Amino acid sequence: MQQSQRGCGQNSYGQSGYRQRGFTLLEIMVVIVILGVLASLVVPNLMGNKEKADRQKAVSDIVSLESALDMYKLDNNRYPSTEQGLKALVTKPTVQPEPRNYPADGYIRRLPQDPWGTDYQLLNPGQHGKLDIFSLGPDGMPGTEDDIGNWNLDKK
């Protein structure tokens, strides 16, 4: 018997006798283009949802802080001063006017930060009402249009 010139056990499909499988460069490029198109459609929608979620978290935090401040006022017949700030809800203020009926564990466990990593602010008296509780918003600057406060919680 004569062996073929290709050698023992070899054929046109490779050494193992099976056809080699895989994706061509063109197929891989088509998949990458499709993924890019899908990403360009989805990412802008997700970014808009993040902004809405951040705003909603700030609104929720401000409403919670308002409730805690109302409890503070019920116990002490006044809100904390601007100088005492929202920290007066966590620990008893030592700055005048000191509260007379302050609970041992405060009114809240800890102060939340707004979604942009900034502390919420308290103004007493407020510029928009009796008391202003607000976030400086995404830009972190006071007095700008993106501030979120208890005076504009319904704004979208």
UniProtKB/Swiss-Prot annotation:
Positions of the pro-segment in this chain: 1-22
Main location: membrane
Entry's Gene Ontology BP terms: protein secretion by the type II secretion system
Membrane protein topology class: Single-pass membrane protein
Localisation per UniProt entry: Cell inner membrane
Alphabetized UniProt keyword annotations: Cell inner membrane, Cell membrane, Membrane, Methylation, Protein transport, Transmembrane, Transmembrane helix, Transport
One Pfam family here: N_methyl
Keyword field contains ATP-binding: no
Transmembrane regions: 23-43
PTM-bearing positions, type N-methylphenylalanine: F23
Post-translational modification: Cleaved by the prepilin peptidase. Methylated by prepilin peptidase at the amino group of the N-terminal phenylalanine once the leader sequence is cleaved.
GO cellular component: plasma membrane; type II protein secretion system complex
Complex and partners: Type II secretion system is composed of four main components: the outer membrane complex, the inner membrane complex, the cytoplasmic secretion ATPase and the periplasm-spanning pseudopilus. Forms homomultimers.
Task performed by this protein: Core component of the type II secretion system required for the energy-dependent secretion of extracellular factors such as proteases and toxins from the periplasm. Pseudopilin (pilin-like) protein that polymerizes to form the pseudopilus. Further polymerization triggers pseudopilus growth.
Family affiliation: Belongs to the GSP G family.
PANTHER family, per the entry: GENERAL SECRETION PATHWAY PROTEIN G, TYPE II SECRETION SYSTEM CORE PROTEIN G
Protein name: Type II secretion system core protein G
Species of origin: Pectobacterium carotovorum subsp. carotovorum
Lineage of origin: Bacteria, Pseudomonadati, Pseudomonadota, Gammaproteobacteria, Enterobacterales
